[in-house]
């Protein structure tokens, strides 16, 4: 009995394979699209793609084109071909503005760009592109059921950009004394704090700004030292005002003692 079932399964598999190969070689668009739809419904997306990529160029403007291009776009998505899926969904949404699938296509297209966003340490061109696509979706469909997920994706991407900006500012601080360039890290930290006023890295950024100003003051010529020591002291006060129990307090307090000791020579003049 088991042997019979095994033989039948093999025969069915060969029959299915033969049907697929015949459809690929066929010039009949109806044969290709019918079998592609069957494969799509059964989750065989790679075969769906192979058939529809052959058929789709000849179907533009035809009555069933909308369905075909949606299936092709979704098949790209399901097989994680996100670049192809992103542009396919974008094209679908543009070409079929009245389609009931347009909203879904717009969201999935934007999500495809999100999937290509790299880790924060790499170039973020794709992250900015994904944010642009997601924001466009949010503006177009403010009441969409996809809105909660769209907002989650936007937050994740903006958090990534925030972390990258912070790490760049932090790196500037770490090399400031070595290169004797203190203005650059101060400017970068100021830009970061202005761009991300509610950042979770604010305590860190405020300390790094203070630390940079502290280094700047101690490495200054006498004619500019007093002013820079005063600026460093003000940065310390800003840090403590933001968080009196800052994790940097022990280090910052020691730096402040040195700043005040340096300032005494000017108060005695």
Language-model regions: role of each:
Residues 5, 16-269:
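Acidic, polar-rich low-complexity tracts and alpha-helical solenoid repeat scaffolds
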Residues 12-14:
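Hydrophobic core
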